[in-house]
Amino acid sequence: MAAAALRDQLTALLSSMFSQGLVDEQFQQLQMLQDEGGTPGFVSEVVTLFCDDADRIINEIATLLEQPVVNFDKVDAYVHQLKGSSASVGAQKVKFTCMQFRQFCQDKSRDGCLMALAVVRNDFYDLRNKFQTMLQLEQQIQAYDPKQQ
């Protein structure tokens, strides 16, 4: 009974992530790959790698924007990398924010980049918190029924 309640919570969480635009069909594809391939932990591994990578990239961008003379090409390269990582995991909102961020890089606008950094950081932290909750629910479900991924 408890596993069913946890599955309901997980379903509601995933549904809210889609409806809020945090994730898109690419994330759904990752889930399907896990289900069809019978590879438990695949989504967990991909999400964890994405979160670690995105956190590192955001910190690198912040460091670059603190410099007296900003290397906008370097900032843009990191934002492009974050956009690609976001797209591959289905992190739709972060991906769209990165697209806007890149425009500020091309305009060489420090203020615009700082504003975009705050937005992308907020979007990422929101998504990361949801991913962490999702992974915790999946672990709890698996503890009740080890045959489930």
UniProtKB/Swiss-Prot annotation:
Pfam families: Hpt (PF01627). Residues 39-144 form the HPt domain. Two-component system major event consists of a His-to-Asp phosphorelay between a sensor histidine kinase (HK) and a response regulator (RR). In plants, the His-to-Asp phosphorelay involves an additional intermediate named Histidine-containing phosphotransfer protein (HPt). This multistep phosphorelay consists of a His-Asp-His-Asp sequential transfer of a phosphate group between first a His and an Asp of the HK protein, followed by the transfer to a conserved His of the HPt protein and finally the transfer to an Asp in the receiver domain of the RR protein. It comes from the Eukaryota. InterPro entries: AHP1-5/YPD1 (IPR045871), HPT_dom_sf (IPR036641), Sig_transdc_His_kin_Hpt_dom (IPR008207). GO terms for molecular function: histidine phosphotransfer kinase activity; protein histidine kinase binding. It is found in: Cytoplasm, Cytosol; Nucleus. Widely expressed. Disruption phenotype: Dwarf, narrow leaf, small grain and low fertility phenotypes. Keywords: Cytokinin signaling pathway, Cytoplasm, Nucleus, Phosphoprotein, Sensory transduction, Two-component regulatory system. Transmembrane segments: none annotated. GO terms for biological process: cytokinin-activated signaling pathway; phosphorelay signal transduction system; positive regulation of cytokinin-activated signaling pathway. Histidine-containing phosphotransfer domain (HPt) contains an active histidine that mediates the phosphotransfer. PANTHER family: HISTIDINE-CONTAINING PHOSPHOTRANSFER PROTEIN 2 (PTHR28242:SF30), PHOSPHORELAY INTERMEDIATE PROTEIN YPD1 (PTHR28242). This is Histidine-containing phosphotransfer protein 2. It comes from Oryza sativa subsp. japonica (Rice).
